[in-house]
A protein has these predicted regions:
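Phosphate-group recognition and catalysis centered on beta-loop-alpha active-site segments
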Residues: 2-339
Length: 339
């Protein structure tokens, strides 16, 4: 009579477990596909992360104005400029976080219904930060409660000067590219649908005109815009240096592949993850995630980081870049690393 050992695993179960362990081990050691081919300029080259000025530094000057970007450049000449683009009725790409003018200016209406020429001729002021629930116009103030005029900007890059001492004129993407010909610029397409696709087309035209493929990042939270980036990348219509980041769902896709150990099968050609430190209670800034992205040659850029402790945590974990509304605050911390 055979004796059974109580609790002994069935051979089939053992085999299944061994197969699963072997599969995960194989996935771990398989070389990760390179999402971005060649040297990725969005990855840091030393210990310190790259400073990214969110909307030019939205806490120090009115965001998405040329003056804000001048201020950011005065803090760090290597700064990455982050901005938002919308296309006007007459086909000009202007910088603005919302698709309407209501929050940031002294006029109302969707940007797609305004001509850029009218914005300039009417001297529309982009120096406001109006509350959505109020009809009252509120001029931008810094964190100390001070109203900031363009004339308050002290340091202009060589060869450049102020446009208007009192108001913040509409800023175009082309102006930004010309003002900072050496800096990387991250552009988020804010409009969706056909209007957003028109904005992408015009941005591509400008990038081609100025041969700026190696310094423009294309971004969007709109899934249809991200799908267009993927299509352009896979179709060969853009050079290999074309850089883009995923939409929210695109980022979720990468994180899901990473969490389940399936990132060896991740094939989207993104150059950078532009993500928060946490989303839906899930931490996204661990050393492990950052290192895993690096194996795919994907840079990790975190937004919008205004707390000093968060900045230090990201530095410790090895983030490639930190996006902030306060360039001076982050620069002070980064300078402290060098001492």
């Amino acid at each position: 009579m055979k004796k059974s050992i109580k609790g002994a695993a069935h051979p089939a179960v053992v085999i299944v477990i061994l197969v699963i362990v072997a599969a995960f081990a194989l996935l771990y050691f398989i070389p990760k596909p390179q999402s971005f081919e060649g040297t990725n300029p969005l990855r840091k080259t030393g210990e310190a992360p790259i400073l990214v000025a969110h909307r030019g530094g939205d806490g120090e000057f009115p965001g998405n104005t040329l003056e804000a970007f001048y201020n950011a450049y005065s803090v760090d000449e290597r700064v990455i400029m982050e901005t938002d683009i919308n296309i006007t009725k007459d086909g000009v790409l202007i910088l603005n976080h919302e698709t309407s003018l209501d929050k940031r200016t002294n006029v109302k209406g969707n940007i797609a219904d305004w001509n850029y020429t009218d914005l300039i001729e009417q001297r529309v002021n982009f120096g406001y930060h109006n509350k959505a629930e109020s009809e009252e116009l509120t001029l931008f103030m810094d964190e100390y409660g001070k109203q900031i005029k363009p004339s308050d900007l002290e340091n202009y890059p060589n060869g450049l000067e102020g446009r208007d001492p009192e108001i913040y004129l509409a800023t175009t993407l082309e102006e930004l590219m010309l003002a900072f010909p050496e800096n990387i610029i991250s552009i988020e397409v804010k409009q969706g649908g056909d209007t957003g696709l028109l904005a992408v087309k015009e941005a591509l035209r400008l990038v081609e005109k100025y041969n700026a493929w190696d310094r423009i990042i294309f971004a969007s939270f709109k899934d249809e815009i991200f799908a267009e980036y993927c299509r352009l990348d896979k179709s060969g219509e853009v050079p290999d240096s074309f850089m883009y980041s995923p939409s929210l769902m695109g980022a979720v896709k990468y994180v899901a592949f990473y969490v389940f150990g399936l990132d060896a099968f991740y094939t989207d050609g993104i150059a950078v993850l532009q993500i928060p430190m946490e989303e839906y209670g899930i931490g996204l800034c661990s050393k492990r995630l950052i290192n895993n992205a690096r194996k795919h040659n994907i840079a990790t850029h975190y937004w919008t980081i205004n707390d000093e402790d968060d900045m230090r945590k990201l530095i410790e974990n090895g983030a490639d870049a930190i996006m902030t509304d306060y360039p001076h605050k982050l620069k002070n911390i980064l300078d402290g690393l060098e001492k």
